[in-house]
């Protein structure tokens, strides 16, 4: 409380509060020098951090573009295989219609057996093609996932320091869960 009294006493004696425009007395030069030193010494630090962040972002974007291109390529391959399957289906339908008209002209019992045999062959052919296409697409997807996982594992556990830190962090979390 005594400090406040002293402040008001000094203000009353000096005729109020005023603005000091003397640059040397106010310490403005010191502040400007300090800011200049901070900018000069900090630009390398901030520049390296920003450059590292930029390269990480560029790498992530490039990886995403690569995955998009790969997915588009696989999609176009799957669409081609689907169109081939549709062609096979239309051929089977045409053959079935032709066989049906031919069989209707012949004996009913023989026609029924022949039609059943052809139909079963067509179904098995279609299922076989469908299975081959499915297995091919499945194998391509598995291969792509394994490649991506291996690349990501190398990036994540590339340095021993990062791997140790991750292992220690996991152990600490597990210890916390057990307690």
Swiss-Prot record:
GO MF terms, alphabetically ordered: proton-transporting ATP synthase activity, rotational mechanism
Annotated CDD domains: ATP-synt_Fo_b
Keyword Chloroplast: yes
Transmembrane segments: 28-46
A GO cellular component entry from the record: proton-transporting ATP synthase complex
Annotated compartments: Plastid, Chloroplast thylakoid membrane
The organism's place on the tree of life at top rank: Eukaryota
Keywords assigned: ATP synthesis, CF(0), Chloroplast, Hydrogen ion transport, Ion transport, Membrane, Plastid, Thylakoid, Transmembrane, Transmembrane helix, Transport
Membrane topology term: Single-pass membrane protein
UniProt family annotation: Belongs to the ATPase B chain family.
Subunit details: F-type ATPases have 2 components, F(1) - the catalytic core - and F(0) - the membrane proton channel. F(1) has five subunits: alpha(3), beta(3), gamma(1), delta(1), epsilon(1). F(0) has four main subunits: a(1), b(1), b'(1) and c(10-14). The alpha and beta chains form an alternating ring which encloses part of the gamma chain. F(1) is attached to F(0) by a central stalk formed by the gamma and epsilon chains, while a peripheral stalk is formed by the delta, b and b' chains.
Remarks, miscellaneous: In plastids the F-type ATPase is also known as CF(1)CF(0).
Described purpose of this protein according to its UniProt entry: F(1)F(0) ATP synthase produces ATP from ADP in the presence of a proton or sodium gradient. F-type ATPases consist of two structural domains, F(1) containing the extramembraneous catalytic core and F(0) containing the membrane proton channel, linked together by a central stalk and a peripheral stalk. During catalysis, ATP synthesis in the catalytic domain of F(1) is coupled via a rotary mechanism of the central stalk subunits to proton translocation. Component of the F(0) channel, it forms part of the peripheral stalk, linking F(1) to F(0).
HAMAP family in alphabetical order: ATP_synth_b_bprime (MF_01398)
PANTHER family tied to this protein: ATP SYNTHASE SUBUNIT B, CHLOROPLASTIC
Protein name in the entry: ATP synthase subunit b, chloroplastic
Species this protein is from: Thalassiosira pseudonana
Gene this protein is translated from: atpF
């Amino acid at each position: 409380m005594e400090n406040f009294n002293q402040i008001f006493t000094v203000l009353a004696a000096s005729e109020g509060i005023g603005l000091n425009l003397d640059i040397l007395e106010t310490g403005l030069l010191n502040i400007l020098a300090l800011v200049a030193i901070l900018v000069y010494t900090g630009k390398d630090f901030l520049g390296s951090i920003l450059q590292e962040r930029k390269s990480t972002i560029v790498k992530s974007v490039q990886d995403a573009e690569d995955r998009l291109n790969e997915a588009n390529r696989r999609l176009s391959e799957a669409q081609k295989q689907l169109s081939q399957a549709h062609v096979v289906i239309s051929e089977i339908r045409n053959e079935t219609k032709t066989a049906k008209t031919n069989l209707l002209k012949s004996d009913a019992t023989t026609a029924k057996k022949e039609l059943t045999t052809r139909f079963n062959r067509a179904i098995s052919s279609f299922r076989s093609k469908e299975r081959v296409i499915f297995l091919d697409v499945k194998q391509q997807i598995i291969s792509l996932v394994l490649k991506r996982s291996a690349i990501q594992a190398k990036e994540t556990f590339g340095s021993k320091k990062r791997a140790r830190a991750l292992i220690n962090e996991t152990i600490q979390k597990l210890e916390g869960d057990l307690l």
